[in-house]
Amino acid sequence: MSRLNEYQVIGRNLPTESVPEPKLFRMRIFAPNTVVAKSRYWYFLQKLHKVKKASGEIVSVNIISEAKPTKVKTFGIWLRYESRSGIHNMYKEYRDVTRVGAVETMYQDLAARHRARFRSIHILKVVELEKTDDVKRQYVKQFLTKDLKFPLPHRVQKSKKLFQATAPTTFY
């Protein structure tokens, strides 16, 4: 079970006499629960479309589940984050079985490399890269070769005695 979920939040301005059916705004937001998802929705909506929570309403909040959660996919993530030295745009690629898993890895990666917290990271776009030509980063390309083999270091013998007179060595 992952820490985050992907939510689709749809909201709008409150209806008035001049605008009886206001425009709907939809966002896909990664958050641990619906409360945080709604909060992030209003934060981004106020910045993008000048719609405040006091003069708006949320129409629906739905959780989005992965279509194929057993297939390994490559995801490209466009993001911007606020650091101590300013705002930075970034593009990163991750291999995972779900979008949520890739985004979680991205949050951990940015926390480790750049000391960026959840609140200061804004995800702009998450895209599944279906063609291998679309993959830009070498650290992901190395796993896309045809006959990929991994070394098997530090192997242990298969048949072991029940009792052994000497301490076992693990270097073969």
From Swiss-Prot:
Protein location: Cytoplasm
One GO CC term on file: cytosolic large ribosomal subunit
Highest taxon listed in the record's lineage: Eukaryota
Keywords: Cytoplasm, Ribonucleoprotein, Ribosomal protein
Gene Ontology molecular-function annotations: structural constituent of ribosome
BP GO annotations: cytoplasmic translation
InterPro entries reported for this sequence: Ribosomal_eL20, Ribosomal_eL20_dom, Ribosomal_eL20_eukaryotes
Pfam families referenced in this protein's UniProt entry, alphabetically: Ribosomal_L18A (PF01775)
Function, as annotated: Component of the ribosome, a large ribonucleoprotein complex responsible for the synthesis of proteins in the cell. The small ribosomal subunit (SSU) binds messenger RNAs (mRNAs) and translates the encoded message by selecting cognate aminoacyl-transfer RNA (tRNA) molecules. The large subunit (LSU) contains the ribosomal catalytic site termed the peptidyl transferase center (PTC), which catalyzes the formation of peptide bonds, thereby polymerizing the amino acids delivered by tRNAs into a polypeptide chain.
Assembly, per entry: Component of the large ribosomal subunit. Mature ribosomes consist of a small (40S) and a large (60S) subunit. The 40S subunit contains about 32 different proteins and 1 molecule of RNA (18S). The 60S subunit contains 45 different proteins and 3 molecules of RNA (25S, 5.8S and 5S).
Family: Belongs to the eukaryotic ribosomal protein eL20 family.
UniProt protein name: Large ribosomal subunit protein eL20
Source organism per UniProt: Candida albicans (strain SC5314 / ATCC MYA-2876) (Yeast)
